[in-house]
């Protein structure tokens, strides 16, 4: 089995890099450390890129510090600096070239303000061909609870496949960290109540770790995450095309805005 390829996104205008810290922690916990590709670039939709912003001026020492850290940890890595205007497309292009298995980005935004990500980051989540891990500053070193959010009521085959991906990746994360694994499924009314027995047989889990609750997904998932003190929540966000691709506020985006944990988004 070949090594996993992890693409770690660095914002050079920041002094702290939660995505890098989490990637190093995870790499050292794995039986075989992954190859890591450090993508250094500025998201112009999230940062003031004018000449008046002092954060846009940096010296090569910052990049050297990142490389020194990787060398100190003994991790295999490559690095690139990107000047392209379209951050999201450049990142996806780099991921394709590097044959990325997972992208790790930092989340510096305050979800209480109601705007958690820039348009380019939303586009990344919708269009990435691999899981995207969104890391909050100050995340716990050891993950104790992994929560996977699924939607078993969806009839579309793509959503059923997505549910399977979320469950598989959630179990993988829980095994890696030695954490408890929980599943949450929201439903809107009794006509759409998921069958607990069928769900338990499908995912092969204890009943007390499967949470089926009525309500809006963003409320049900965020409340379950708080009650369980989840360290990471896995959600699905299928790519959209045409007019829908330009719209904000779909279910996964509302869920992300409500959560105050690390999040792994899968397509």
Segments from the language model and where they lie:
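Gly/Ser-rich helix-loop-strand patches that form or flank binding pockets
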Residues: 95-142, 225-267
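Small/aliphatic-rich secondary-structure junction motif
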Residues: 1-53, 142-207
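A short helix-to-beta-strand connector/capping loop
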Residues: 70-78, 179, 203-209
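Glycine-centered short loops/turns at secondary-structure junctions
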Residues: 31-33, 74, 99, 178, ...
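Glycine/small-residue-rich hydrophobic helix-like segments
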Residues: 185-235
């Amino acid at each position: 089995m070949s090594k996993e390829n992890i693409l770690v996104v660095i914002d050079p205008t920041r002094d702290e890099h939660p995505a890098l810290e989490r990637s190093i922690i995870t790499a050292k916990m794995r039986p075989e450390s992954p190859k890591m590709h450090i993508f250094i670039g500025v998201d112009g939709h999230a940062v003031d890129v004018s000449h008046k912003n002092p954060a846009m001026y940096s010296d090569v020492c910052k990049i050297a510090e990142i490389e020194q850290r990787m060398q100190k940890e003994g991790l295999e890595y490559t690095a690139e600096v990107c000047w392209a205007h379209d951050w999201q497309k450049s990142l996806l292009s780099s991921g394709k070239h590097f044959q990325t298995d997972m992208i790790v980005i930092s989340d510096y935004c305050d979800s209480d303000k109601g705007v958690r990500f820039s348009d380019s980051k939303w586009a990344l989540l919708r269009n990435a061909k691999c899981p995207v891990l969104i890391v909050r500053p100050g995340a716990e070193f050891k993950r104790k609870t992994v929560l996977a959010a699924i939607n078993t009521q969806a009839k579309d085959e793509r959503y059923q496949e997505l549910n399977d991906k979320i469950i598989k990746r959630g179990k993988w994360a829980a095994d890696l960290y030695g954490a408890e694994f929980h599943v949450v499924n929201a439903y809107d009314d009794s006509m759409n109540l998921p069958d607990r027995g069928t769900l338990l047989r499908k995912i092969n889990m204890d009943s007390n770790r499967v949470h089926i609750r009525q309500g809006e997904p963003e409320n049900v998932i965020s409340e379950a995450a708080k009650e369980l003190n989840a360290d990471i929540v896995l959600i699905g966000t299928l790519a959209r095309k045409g007019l829908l691709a330009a719209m904000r506020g779909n279910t996964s985006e509302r869920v992300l805005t409500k959560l105050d944990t690390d999040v792994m988004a899968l397509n």
